[in-house]
């Protein structure tokens, strides 16, 4: 029986009977995979702690006829402190959902995995504004799944630009003043510059960025459009994020 080992984060889980459940793990080596954890629902199961949502650990699997089964696991960080604050829980659930909707099963993406785990640790240690961190992660997600935004050049005529008043969902970037605007939305120069800056900034340095609410709201709307357009599903957590932003 061949065993597969990888670090990973539990994205979500689903009960399949009174004892067993399926967990979806974003792994470093194999991308997102679904895994049967037999007996994980039992109170004394060795799998119980390692199969909770958000848990980051070392996992060992074996391949069955149709899917992986969990053989063993060791917790690196449970991230269960996320559960104690509603806003933090909602944002972290949203990040997990982004990974789930953007990644096909078995599609490795080590760069995105690194950004994902780093973002979790930054949130855990309260390093920076969680909303700005989420926008930065969305930009990394778009880049590492093939939808990188072109913000240094006009997306139509390819002329170099310092800023733009319009972002096109069709052309994945800014539109200069000489080109026709289509398939996107207007943006203020401040929000455009902030998007461009965040897109290039390492995730661990995002704490240095201080954005006002208007800019954060603009960025939220712009990136929500790209995410809704390019992935198979719209994250359900977006509804909760909207509630948080309205409070």
UniProtKB/Swiss-Prot annotation:
What GO biological process, any one, is recorded here? double-strand break repair
The source's superkingdom equals Bacteria
In terms of Pfam families, this protein maps to: RecO_C (PF02565), RecO_N (PF11967)
The family database entries (SUPFAM superfamilies) matched by this protein are listed as:
ArfGap/RecO-like zinc finger, Nucleic acid-binding proteins
Could you state one GO cellular component term attached to this entry? bacterial nucleoid
Entry keyword set: DNA damage, DNA recombination, DNA repair
Entry's InterPro entries?
ARFGAP/RecO, DNA_rep/recomb_RecO_N, NA-bd_OB-fold, RecO, RecO_C
**Similarity field:** Belongs to the RecO family.
Describe the function of this protein. Involved in DNA repair and RecF pathway recombination.
Q: Which PANTHER family match?
A: DNA REPAIR PROTEIN RECO
Q: State the name under which the record lists this protein.
A: DNA repair protein RecO
Native organism is: Clostridium acetobutylicum (strain ATCC 824 / DSM 792 / JCM 1419 / IAM 19013 / LMG 5710 / NBRC 13948 / NRRL B-527 / VKM B-1787 / 2291 / W)
């Amino acid at each position: 029986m061949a065993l597969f080992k990888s670090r990973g984060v539990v994205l979500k889980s689903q009960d399949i009977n009174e004892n067993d459940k399926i967990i979806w793990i974003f792994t470093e080596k194999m991308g997102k995979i679904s895994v049967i954890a037999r007996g994980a629902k039992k109170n004394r199961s060795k799998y119980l702690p390692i199969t909770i949502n958000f848990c980051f650990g070392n996992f060992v699997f074996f391949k069955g006829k149709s899917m992986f089964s969990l053989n063993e696991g060791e917790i690196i960080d449970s991230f269960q402190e996320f559960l104690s604050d509603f806003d933090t829980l909602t944002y972290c659930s949203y990040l997990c959902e982004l990974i789930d909707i953007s990644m096909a099963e078995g599609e490795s993406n080590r760069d995105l995995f690194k950004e994902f785990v780093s973002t979790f640790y930054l949130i855990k240690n309260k390093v920076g504004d969680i909303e700005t961190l989420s926008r930065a992660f969305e930009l990394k997600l778009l880049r590492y799944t093939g939808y990188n935004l072109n913000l240094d050049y006009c997306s139509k005529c390819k002329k170099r630009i310092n800023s733009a008043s319009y972002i096109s969902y069709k052309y994945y970037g800014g539109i200069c003043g000489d080109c026709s605007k289509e398939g996107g939305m207007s943006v203020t120069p401040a929000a455009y510059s902030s998007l461009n800056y965040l897109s290039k900034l390492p995730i661990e340095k995002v704490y240095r960025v201080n954005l006002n609410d208007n800019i954060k709201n603009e960025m939220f709307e712009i990136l929500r459009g790209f995410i809704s357009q390019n992935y198979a599903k719209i994250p359900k957590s977006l509804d909760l994020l909207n509630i948080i932003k309205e409070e």
